[in-house]
Amino acid sequence: MHKSAALSLRDAQFADMNMYCDVTDRTPIEAVHSCNNAESLNILNKLLARETDTALSQIFEQPTGKDWKELNTLQTILSLCSTVTMALLLGPDTAPDPVLHHHSTSFGEAIMSSCYRRTGYPRILRPFVWRFSSECRNLRKHFSLVRERLVPEVARRVAAARAADKTKDVRPSSLLDALIAAAFDNGSLSPDDQGRNDAAQVQLLADDLIFYHFELCKPTAFNIIFQLYAIMDHPEYKAPLREEALQALKLTNGDWTVETLKHAPKLESFTKETFRLYDISGFVSFRRVMKPLTLNSIGLSLRPGTILLSPCRNVHLDPEIYEDPTTFNGYRFYDSSREVCSPRVATTSLTFLTFSHGAGSCPARVLATQICRTIFIKFLLQYDVEPVQKEILPYGFTSGPVYMPNPSVMMRIRPRSDGK
């Protein structure tokens, strides 16, 4: 198995997704890798920018004039990211589906509670918990309803891809297009004719979309939420980040492209610092010992079945690695002499483990960081934002292995007259 696919398998098992998905399927990994090129990322980023503008106006219901509107930060950004993610999955020509949006969001919210409930029991009892507990039944309900909405669209798009002119090299305009192309390439689906196994493969692609939605929506939403908490707590960053973004737009003729983001190193540093200090996962690089292993350097023997983890948060808060590590410094990674973010936000290392490191690094990290930066800076350009609460609330709390944004933080917003 490819190492990236193996990582996907481990992560999926950790979130209990192996209970309802074929987590050994390599197609979603191959599809993401096929999009990791400048042309595909630009296509997706333009769609991301357009859909973000649309979602912002719909979700915030556009307060008028100088009126402020109070919103729950967590719920608002989760809804926004769910809407934008679904557009990236299905493409620009798919009509919004409120029912699909509701059940996709509800499914994402149910994943970890279902996992905690099931794994809180001895292994011998877990099948019964999966079948009868209210948390697991709720998750299965939303999963089946999302699948029911997606399968017809996937089948329609597979048929359209088969009928398309195959002599043209057309880049995918959505992640579903990339999934279908990957399935054609690896033989899961025939690119020419309907096969006997089509129904099962179409359902598997629908399941891959559900997996994508969870993986792209939840982590990016949490990072954007933490960026908003940070900007409300440190308003001195607002003007420089807005000014940099507007200058970057001028350099790309007003179009939101991957190049626009490259011209915004302060924004990239701000986003990376948020990942570092408010990383949603305390551990990364899940590994299972397959045969007896001895770590001679520390004299530790490990039995097969032992789970190994890398302590991401401990590394990010290590004072020997980062100066004053518990203090937010939005320009920590900004090199003013070269006007770059160094290292880049999607660059992994032994000292920056948000996306793991090495061969098992998150394959979607480039797209994920584009989502985080684009949605955050578009929000900041279009709206004034300030905290509702006078006291500074904790940014988040630990729930199992996940660092969750504080759901009590409220924000107050109003449109900016010169927003772009």
Swiss-Prot record:
It is an enzyme of class 1 (oxidoreductase). Transmembrane segments: none annotated. The keyword Oxidoreductase applies. Heme binds at C362. Its cofactor is heme. Keywords: Heme, Iron, Metal-binding, Monooxygenase, Oxidoreductase. This is Bicoumarin synthase ktnC. It comes from Aspergillus niger (strain ATCC MYA-4892 / CBS 513.88 / FGSC A1513). The lineage of its organism: Eukaryota, Fungi, Dikarya, Ascomycota, Pezizomycotina.
